[in-house]
Every structure is written in C-alpha cells, then in structure tokens.
Amino acid sequence: SWKGQDLFIEAIKLVKIELGYEAFHAVILGNDQGRDLYKKKLIRLTEQYGLTNQIKFIDHCEDMALAYKVSDIVVSASIEPEAFGRVAVEAQSMEKLIIASNIGGSNETIIDEKTGFLFKSGDAESLSKKIIHGLTMDETSINLMGKEGRSNIIKKFNVEKMCFSTYSEYK
C-alpha cells in the first residue's frame, strides 16, 4: 500500500537486529479499508520476521490525541507523495518526534533534523537509521525537537495565514 506499512515492518526488522527486541514496541494504526489481503500480508511479514512481540495492529482509534500523546516517535512511511501529509502536521502539533519519507507534503512541513527526520522514500534501511537515531536520542533533545515542531506548525498553519493564502490563490 502507498502508506508504506510493509516498508515500516522491514525497517523495524532492521531496528530489532541493531537494538534488540526489548528496546521498542511499534503500533500500526488504521483499518485496512477493505484491503483484507494486504493486512494479512502485513501480519504474515510480522510473523516471518519474528516481530509479533514488537508490532501490534490497531484497526481504529477513537482518540487520536491520546494515541499521539502515548507515542514516543511517529512514523509516516508513505511511498507515494501525499499532497499535505496530515500525520506529520498532527505529530508536530502534539510535540512528537516525526519521521517521514522525503516526498510530498512532508518536505514542506518538516524541517529535517530540526522538527523531525526525513528518510529516503522507499528505503527501509534509511528509515531504520532514522528510527534508531530517534530511539537513542536523549530526552532533552527529543523534547526540544518536539517543541520546534509545534512552533513550526503554529507558524505555518495558523488560521489567519491559511485564510490569506487561500484568498490570494483565488484573487
């Protein structure tokens, strides 16, 4: 799928090899939107790589704010460009460390190495290195990056600025 869940699983396999299995847990959040075969493929991949203790699948979340709050790192592994990239914006607004592919909207919303990390789209090794970097950062650096991310989003996406930009387009 274009969301890159299979790429994420490949990257987590590499993270496990590097850091060990007790260093992290990952959640793949969101329903399969009728793509039952794809979800079964993801589950098989997780089993094949011995990641069933690290990766959990959650179909639906009623409280995304809480999901972000309990996360240390948020990953958007899209392999096709997203026009906006809502996950990256939401994660930054919640002061979370975001790791996203270097295509589409993420290039506009994330300042690499300052408000989050961008990895080479479609490259599991590149993604795994960013995840490892995020998992091994000290808490002060993670918090600072989160605050920078929130500040970045507030500057770029306040209502007044968005209205002016929209008005300017139609003018």
Segments predicted by a language model, with ranges:
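Active-site donor-binding acidic/aromatic loop of nucleotide-activated sugar
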Residues: 34-39, 52-61, 67, 117-118
